């Protein structure tokens, strides 16, 4: 694939850069199409991205419809058929600014002013369209073979909410139509698995703008799943000596100044509330509260390790564009814990946390994940606590422990928490990009800030080390992950309704009610569908909408024999004695069998 660089030379494109160049060129072709249809359009930035491209554009008061996006895409195809040559040129600063001013490219002019040290600027031209760009690009527009405009959204100029809101138009581009078709198939699968779609169908959770964006509410069915997850992880933690606590959802601003959140994390926090001369804030994390619980009484080395756990309500200000159902909201419940230990106990505590993570993943059949050692960016003094010695010690300690434990990991700069390095376990969901579920963070910073101590064997006071860890991450995100992995077909122990009783007709309603009562007595979550509908409709509703693990189809034959006809989600049926069926289901519940 031939590409042209800003100095005008043409060469073969390195294979690992092909998609980037294709997508960057697609952004220019889209901008040209927009300019033809909307001559007053004023363009900001239009880069290639990991999965496609976008362009931010100021369209004045014009609001684009889906039909408008289709027209832009149609014009893009016209431009590719014109097979316009893509040619670079370079201008000195004064001429470059004049060119952009003449073309009414106000955002480009402002951007050039920001690049005060640049003496010249490069441009690429195709037909009548000119864009300031460093390239490289395809040599002709006809080389752009497969693309699609996907959506529009809002974006602030320079990502600053004080600036004008622009229209961001997104698209995708690939080498050929086959790759685009494969992407569209993947997108269809993503839509079918989307936890927001399934959550609505199953009545798991809801959102309402009157309540607030990013503030989902769990309905009875969804809260049942949520409670089962809570019970599961608390049992695991209790078996490992965790002590569970409950702390307030707010704290004073001074609390977060002490912890450092106010200096390093304030942009992710909600504004402070003033009450009786004191400032309070919704908590984004639970660390400060747990530090105060440890500080509540004196400690000896004999008390350590001390493991404090909580299913805690947290609140973070997320921009509206990043919100996604229960996967990412402004309120969530974190499976949080803080482990206070001596330096000598770091290895064993990290090992126990890792074992708990991997044991949990095995229970939920999670196999596609990778471990990342997230480190600070030493150049970013604003984001991270400024103590080089502490950071070097903490990063080396966690790196050594993970290496000794034989855990394969990669390292990523700039992804640490502000107070210390961490192990992130990133999962690859059924569709979409990977994200972090579990974390284990090593912290020498907060214990010192809160003046935490313990009396060591030699009688001297020392500062404990703290491990911050979350196994399920937030229960909300973990539930979203499970919904998309299973398409809502939860294993029996997690399912909101574990058995649905379906009487064939009114004649077997009394028998169905008796069976329902017996299942309830056995501790099974059961629902009786006594609607006056045909049995085929009832089966489809239970199987395809409610995704119930088991359906009992009860007709005259079953009522007479005193047994049940069992139908599972796969459509397989068998006849069983009532007690036999109850034993099967209760065993799956007790053992938390992962069958879906």
Task: Give short role names for the model-derived ranges.
Residues 1-42, 50, 56-596:
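NTP/phosphate- and nucleic-acid-binding module
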Residues 45:
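Conserved P-loop NTP-binding catalytic core
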């Amino acid at each position: 694939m031939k590409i042209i660089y800003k100095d005008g030379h043409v060469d073969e494109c390195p294979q690992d850069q092909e998609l980037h160049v294709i997508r960057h060129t697609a952004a220019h072709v889209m901008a040209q199409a927009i300019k033809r249809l909307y001559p007053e359009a004023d363009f900001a930035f239009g880069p290639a991205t990991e999965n496609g491209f976008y362009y931010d554009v100021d369209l004045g008061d014009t609001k684009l419809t889906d039909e408008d996006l289709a027209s832009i895409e149609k014009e893009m195809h016209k431009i590719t058929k014109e097979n316009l040559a893509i040619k670079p040129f370079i201008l000195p600063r004064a001429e470059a600014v004049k060119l952009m001013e003449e073309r009414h490219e106000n955002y480009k002019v402002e951007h050039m002013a920001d690049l005060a040290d640049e003496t010249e600027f490069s441009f690429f031209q195709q037909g009548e369209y000119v864009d300031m760009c460093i390239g490289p690009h395809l040599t002709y527009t006809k080389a752009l073979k497969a693309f699609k405009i996907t959506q529009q959204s809002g974006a602030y100029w320079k990502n600053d909410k004080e600036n004008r809101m622009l229209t961001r138009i997104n698209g995708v581009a690939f080498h050929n139509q086959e790759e685009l078709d494969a992407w569209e198939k993947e997108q269809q699968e993503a839509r079918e698995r989307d936890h927001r779609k399934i959550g609505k169908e199953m009545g798991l959770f809801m959102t309402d703008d009157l309540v607030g964006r990013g503030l989902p509410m769990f309905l009875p069915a969804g809260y049942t799943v949520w409670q089962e997850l809570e019970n599961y992880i608390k049992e695991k933690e209790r078996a490992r000596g965790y002590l569970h606590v409950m702390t307030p959802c707010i704290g004073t601003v001074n609390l977060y100044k002490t912890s450092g959140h106010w200096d390093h994390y304030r942009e992710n926090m909600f504004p402070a509330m003033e009450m009786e001369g004191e400032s309070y804030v919704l908590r984004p994390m639970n660390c400060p509260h747990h530090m105060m619980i440890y500080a509540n009484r004196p400690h000896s080395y004999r008390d350590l390790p001390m493991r404090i756990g909580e299913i805690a309500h947290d609140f973070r200000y997320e921009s509206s564009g990043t919100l996604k159902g229960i996967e990412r909201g402004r309120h969530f419940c974190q499976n949080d814990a803080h482990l206070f230990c001596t330096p000598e106990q770091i290895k064993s505590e990290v090992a126990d946390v890792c074992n708990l993570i991997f044991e949990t993943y095995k229970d939920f059949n999670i196999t596609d994940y990778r471990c990342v050692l997230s480190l600070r960016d030493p150049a970013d003094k604003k984001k991270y606590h400024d103590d080089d010695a502490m950071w070097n010690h903490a990063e080396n300690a966690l790196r050594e422990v993970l290496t000794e434990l034989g855990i394969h990991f990669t390292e990523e700069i700039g992804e640490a928490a502000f107070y210390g390095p961490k192990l992130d376990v990133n999962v690859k969901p059924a569709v979409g990009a990977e994200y972090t579920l579990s974390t284990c963070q090593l912290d020498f910073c907060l214990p010192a800030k809160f003046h935490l101590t313990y009396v060591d064997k030699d009688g001297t006071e020392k500062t404990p080390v703290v491990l911050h860890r979350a196994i399920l991450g937030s229960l909300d995100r973990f539930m979203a992950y499970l919904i998309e992995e299973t398409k809502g077909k939860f294993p029996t122990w997690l399912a909101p309704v574990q058995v649905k009783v379906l009487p064939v007709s009114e004649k077997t309603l009394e028998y169905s009610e008796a069976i329902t009562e017996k299942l309830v007595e056995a501790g099974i979550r059961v629902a009786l569908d006594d609607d006056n509908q045909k049995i085929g409709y009832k089966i489809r509703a239970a199987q395809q909408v409610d995704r119930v693990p088991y359906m009992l189809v009860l007709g005259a034959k079953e009522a007479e024999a005193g047994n049940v006809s069992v139908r599972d989600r796969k459509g397989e049926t068998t006849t069983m004695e009532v007690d036999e069926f109850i034993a099967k289901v209760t065993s799956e519940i007790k053992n938390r069998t992962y069958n879906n």
